[in-house]
Amino acid sequence: MTGAGNESERAVSKRIDVPPKVEEVFRGFRTCEFSTLTRDGTPIAWPLVTLWQPEERRFVLTTSIGLARKALNVRRDGRVSLLFSDPTASGLEDPPAVLVQGDAEEPDEVRTSPYHVKEYWSRLFRIQPANAMYSANPLTRYLMDWYYLRLYIYVRPSRILWWPGADFGQKPNELEVDHVG
């Protein structure tokens, strides 16, 4: 086998394969509840838009430098969770509720362009069209520059749990994710 073939096989094997219903949730839900731990260990959650990148084995989230508590919590303690529990506007019929537990990192860099992860912003503008309009307005960008200076958070799942029909009274299905590669 050629070197290119081996590289291709490695790329394929790195992908996180989840059941189709779970994949639909990751791609279809508008937001998730992103939970971090405060300095004293108290969990705190925020609604955030996510981008699922199975080939990269991660979720991408962003926050403004003006709302940086999420990133500061991640820098101190990278243990996080993403709960996909609200299917509003997803178009999905009877989706499962999905909990992702994992490790987050927030590189210590501020991005000034909304196109660092272009597919994230394409998704955001698709589900929040008014955001695209405001982002294109130079006056808005000037007055709200703090909002457009972004910190990126990358979450690598270690465990994924899902409850068919979002029935939390039932035992969840579970997928352990290895961190090989």
Summary of predicted features, one role per range:
Residues 28-29, 76-77, 149:
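Structured helix-beta-strand junction loops
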Residues 29-66, 72, 81-85, 96:
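Short beta-strand segments
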Residues 7-31, 35-36:
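Short, conserved active-site entrance elements at the starts or edges of catalytic domains
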Residues 64-68, 78-87, 130-140:
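Short acidic (Asp/Glu) patches
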Residues 56-58, 79, 103, 159:
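Structural motif
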Residues 67-69, 169-170:
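Short, surface-exposed beta-strand-loop junctions and turns on beta-sheet-rich folds
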Residues 2-16, 91-181:
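Charged, gly/pro-rich active-site loop segments
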Residues 73-77, 166:
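Residue-level signal for well-ordered alpha-helical positions
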